[in-house]
Design a protein with these regions (language model features):
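Non-catalytic cap/lid and distal C-terminal segments of serine-dependent acyl enzymes
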Residues: 1-56, 63-376
Length: 376
């Protein structure tokens, strides 16, 4: 909605300003897109958002001489984006959350404002359900020879856990972040209650140096595939065999999951890879920072000889991510080698709420519960 459109729809400029002031919300959502509104003194206002292929900074229009700024952005239905406002005053730039938008998404770096396109709804299974009995969180410690230090791992234990039963195991990279920012415990409680997945033991790992340990690190792969499962088998009664063992991770955690399964074939039969940072350079430089160099070396080798790291792999990626091309390229490669693949592209970016919204599809593919065994 530009200044011209505002005047056309609201009459005079003064009427347009008054109408927007009364709304007291931003953005304004319609089937074709969203209109961002900022009220306040500024020399310039820019939208800072992360949609691959579009400018990272888009300028607002000022409405006349008023301290009112608007920006119309086309946004397909069911989209979701995270953003901040860049406010320029007296030559100083400040990035702020949208003051008129209560919707925010937290991540390890802080928080962003959230714009939900027309038709987007947060999945109801990501919200607490009083009918779902909550699982518990326990902490275990183990000395890792592979990593040369002690590691503390939080373990999700499902409600109604019994020592006499055996359970599948899911190991989650950045597991505490999945708890904090992707509602993982709520999702597990709900999906187990609804029989969409079986009761699982879920090991939530966290690395002190994830950009190193998750980037094709042999010691980390050995820890995840050998040391951690061995400890969990002593502490809990786990089902044997790769069909009952899974790895999950997002971004670099997706790389770590694929790498560990590839280095230790037969250890895991199920992988959940969300927005994996699968940079490769076998057909040209990866054009990313040097942090990605060890990732590219692993992915190059994986593309040459993928083998069969798992029986089933779930992949997802947001179409607003620069990683969309790398993730797409994996799908035919995996299928060519006899792996069952579920792949989803969504109108979202590289963020935790994107990964949260995919958890039902991911977990029911990796570990279908009684409900899916009946209806699929």
């Amino acid at each position: 909605m530009s200044e011209r459109q505002l005047k056309a729809e609201s009459g005079t400029e003064q009427e347009a300003v008054a109408a927007l002031a009364r709304l007291q919300r931003s953005p304004i959502v319609d089937p074709g897109g969203v209109t961002f509104v900022y009220q306040g003194a500024a020399d310039a206002v820019n939208l800072r958002c992360w949609i691959h292929g579009l400018p990272a900074s888009q300028p607002f229009e000022r409405v006349g001489e008023h301290d009112l700024w608007v920006l119309r952005v086309e946004l397909p239905e069911n989209s979701r984006i995270e953003y901040k406002f860049e406010v320029v005053r007296d030559g100083q730039e400040e990035w702020i959350l949208d003051p008129l938008n209560p919707l925010q998404a937290a991540d390890p770096f802080g928080a962003n404002s959230v714009a939900q396109g027309h038709g987007y709804r947060r999945p109801e299974w990501t919200l607490p359900d009083t009918a779902a009995r909550p699982g518990t969180l326990e902490e275990i410690a183990l000395a890792s020879t592979a990593l040369g230090d002690d590691r503390h791992v939080v373990v999700y234990v499902p409600a109604r856990f019994r020592r006499s039963r055996r359970y599948p195991l899911l190991v989650v990279h950045d597991g505490l972040d999945y708890l904090r920012y992707a509602s993982l415990q709520v999702v597990l409680d709900n999906l187990i209650q609804r029989l969409e997945i079986p009761p699982l033991i879920v090991a939530l790992t966290q690395s002190p140096d994830r950009l190193v340990e998750y980037a094709g690190h042999e010691g980390h792969a050995r820890f995840v595939a050998q040391e951690l499962p061995a400890q969990l088998e002593r502490d809990f009664n786990l089902l044997p065999g790769p069909a009952a063992r899974g790895l999950m991770g997002a971004s670099f955690g997706g790389v770590a999951s694929l790498h560990a399964a590839w280095c230790h074939p037969g250890a895991f039969g199920r992988l959940v890879l969300q927005s994996g940072s699968f940079a490769f350079s076998d057909i040209g430089h990866h054009r990313r920072t040097t942090t990605f160099d060890p990732v590219a070396r692993f992915v190059n080798e994986f593309r040459r000889r993928p083998g069969r790291p798992a029986e089933r792999i779930y992949l997802s990626c947001g179409i607003y991510e620069s990683l969309i091309y790398e993730n797409r390229s994996l799908v035919p490669l995996l299928r060519h080698h006899g792996i069952e693949v579920r792949y989803e592209e969504v109108r979202d970016g590289h963020n935790w709420e994107n990964w949260r919204d995919r958890l039902q599809s991911a977990l029911t593919w990796a570990f279908p519960g009684p409900l899916w065994m009946v209806y699929e």
